[in-house]
């Protein structure tokens, strides 16, 4: 065939394409890169490529696209999991002269525009997320056009296709059905840097038994790894601000939660360091600005969740520090592998905290919905004649909306429900059986991965060898540069004054209580019935005040004087539009003395009168047992009233409404509404701690 000769007789064409892609006139192929390209272009194989981070997997499919398009194949379809990865790949592809279009939540290109360009053969590379395959409009409009003249299909981070993998995504399983519809002889490429043999065999099964696996050594030369156990968050914050300035170049600090990203970033900025935040809740513009600043070296520290994860291409990252432990060795290898792709030396430091286990076990427990939860969703769908939204289902079942979406997504992938438009769902005729054993097996594997991560932290052997063995690569005996190989532990030197400042910082991370604008039925709450913006002192269970709140509520039956003083300090720093003239509180059936005692002591310190004026009209269930907003709102609707014996001041002024815990804000909303209707002009909600996720 002509294309065979094209590749074998003109190897300089491949090399020239690579040099154009990288922008380096002396660039050459890494070992096995040329073979991978020939596998796709010459033999038109299905190839699974397992190579270390920074090896150049994207170069393989960009060069292959360049050649295959020259031979008359259709546009390459690149399925990529993260926006940061998409942006990196699009920039690189355009350097090679590939005409690229991306369809995602941030792109301006519409589906109809993409369809027009495919029909006109004006696009070489189509970049989509796996979730886009679930969009009915995309499936009905774009996929038939791609199927009419298919080209190379690339599944980036192919380990996501396997539910044994650490980052399984249900939408990736749609890809298997897509590939089964393709004719023989069509090249398909799956790429990953983080997959052991079990995950690869599962991925190979879904890509086809004929798929070829090319696996390289996963050792990251020059990356010096180390572990430091600092259970206390204040110690870790002080360590970051003291030691990161001594690290060469720019780098990443990974956190497990968005809240920790915000807290760590603020601490570093307050300490005078050049740091920015990065997580999924930020705008696309803010994330792109942060990516670019890290890429051009103008940013020292990017504090990030896994939203900055797979495939982020920055060869000059000098260090990666984990503020908390990831859930698996595989995930850690992937994240720490961001460091030092093009550097002689780089660092990876794992800081282990006391909260790590609780956070990671929560992730494991939330990963798969229970059988009862799924059947409740199916019961709602079975009872409806018309397609329904997530919010409509949430009004009928006591489940978090995010969990309902997760359930629907899994059922949609399984063909048990069908997405109608972009927002509604309906039941299909397909039967469904809960995969009890499979779910249990995966939960067991996740727990064993967590145990393996603990073993990594405790290991006295080579750190890099531990990681690569976990990925079934036994090629490395010892790296010679990690803390264990060199016998030089990660410095735990801390300034006691800085630790004290970090403790105070954590205790002053007041949170905002946003007023609700709608009631439990979705109707607008009139302005004259709404609470004002409020505050909470801390997060439930956090180091410092959070732990004191937990102890006071669950063990002591009384909140410590330190908490009362901290609340008073919070109020003193509050920039009220109208100063409060009194304090009142939320009554409780289960702890009738706990909050009144807190309110009385706070009012005394503030020098304000205590208004003992609210009462419960009925017993309500604990709000923590209500899983979504609709149920939480209905649970407390009409549950508060003014005591008939209440004595109010002649002239009503702004008042503080105090509770110990805030979660959904519905309790404060309903009680505050009663106070507003009685004539209080402003109600400031105040709580000791928030338990909101």
Question: What residue spans do the PLM features occupy?
Answer:
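Conserved beta-strand elements of the Class I
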Residues: 75-77, 101, 252, 276, ...
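Arginine/glycine-rich "motif VI" loop of SF2 helicases in the C-terminal RecA-like domain
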Residues: 338-345, 369, 576, 605-606, ...
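PRPP-dependent phosphoribosyltransferase catalytic core
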Residues: 486, 501, 505, 669-693
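Active-site signature of alpha/beta-hydrolase-fold catalytic machinery across serine-
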Residues: 62-63, 67, 202, 597, ...
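C-terminal accessory region of SF2 helicases/translocases
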Residues: 299, 321, 325-334, 340-536, ...
